[in-house]
Amino acid sequence: LNFLTEPLPESKRKKLLKLVASNLNRSHGIVCISEFVRHDLEQHRDLFQISEETPITVVHNGIFLPEEGQISGITRDPIVPNAPYLLALGVLYEKKQQHLLVPALCHLPEELHLVLIYSEAKSEYLSKIQRMIQQYRLEDRVHLLCAVSDVEKASLLQHCRALLQPSIAEGFGLPVVEAMALGKPIFLRPATSLPEVGGDVAYYFDEVSPEAIAGTILSGLSAYDMSPSQTEALRARARLFDYRRMAQGYLQFYHEILPI
């Protein structure tokens, strides 16, 4: 439901509202991918004309969790920087807030790089990030990678120091689960659905000044490095989002809703 709060032309917002409402108010049941989304939808039942009789339930997204042998078998792809790096993964939209990571890099050790993977981008936001990279003279430390393959993405996740997700608008956050499944430390914005996914194994950006972000990353990496059990704690958290649990959730929902 991001379109309700995003800075969109009013004509487009009305068009989206009509489209979403026409789907929701004819449904016999609705599945949300997080408790955050369910709460948001419950708050807008009247707006979407959803009957009070229509059940709204939650089935978290799930992934195929890698086995131990698969993790150790992920090789270092040539696309991976030849330096320790932090990773951010997602579309380059203003709501994802990746631009906050660029000035923060100035307050981190020079040997640490930043990799931004994106599948698509708003041209003005991509230009904004590129200008910031030039402004802070970080051309050699920030890597923008568009539309990487699944093999490349797996390698970039496996060899990163940590995953960073400073977004202020998430319905779920699959990259967080993908990183946890590999035992990688995760740094999240305490907003929307992200705390629901990261739980108590994540580190959170409570403040987003460059110095505060860098401080959170440094203290989190230090704590992670000094706690060998943290890797297994992250993997255990990821197991809550196994695709089999997701499938079972949908199966149960269909049994409750459909006359089968």
PLM-predicted stretches and their roles:
Residues 1-260:
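Carbohydrate transferase catalytic cores enriched for Leloir-type hexosyltransferases
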